[in-house]
Amino acid sequence: MNTILFDLDGTLIDSSEGIIKCVLYTLDFYGIKEPDTAKLYRFIGPPLSESFERYYGFSHEKAYEAVQKYRERYNTTGIFECKLYPGVEKCIRTLKEQGYQIGMASSKPEVSCKRILEHFGILPLFDDVVGATFDGTRDKKSEIL
């Protein structure tokens, strides 16, 4: 049986609004003002801790704490500040009807991925959903795949 894997952010959903607002929330907590929100699009895709380290010079420990702060807002509000791209549901349904197994692999936490797919009513279309763990033991795409 053939399998098709999708990413979540930027492939199935436009999550930019929620991610950017949560990064701004986190930076504000640390007293950092980012006037150019376009720079924050770099946070979409890679693990958050790596982005805080790379773009704001956070130590590994501070980046871990920043991710926890980010999740304070994300888990209640930011997670739903996203949009399913047009045609995604129809595409996945068509692939399922043609006999494909459908999977999703994301560096976003697996629990969050499932909540988002459920929010849009498409979780049952996926044979498997794999994402990062909250404890950081699985957060790179290579580990997820």
Locate each region found by the language model.
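Short helix-capping segments at alpha-helix termini
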Residues: 28-33, 59-61, 97-98, 121-125
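Metal-dependent phosphoesterase signature
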Residues: 53-93
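Active-site neighborhood of HAD-like aspartate-dependent phosphohydrolases
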Residues: 1-42, 56
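Substrate-recognition "cap/lid" segment bordering the active-site pocket of phosphatases
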Residues: 110-145
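Short, acidic loop-to-helix structural element flanking the phosphoryl-transfer center
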Residues: 76-104, 110-114, 139-142
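Helix-loop "lid/cap" segments that line or gate small-molecule binding pockets
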Residues: 26-27, 47-60, 116
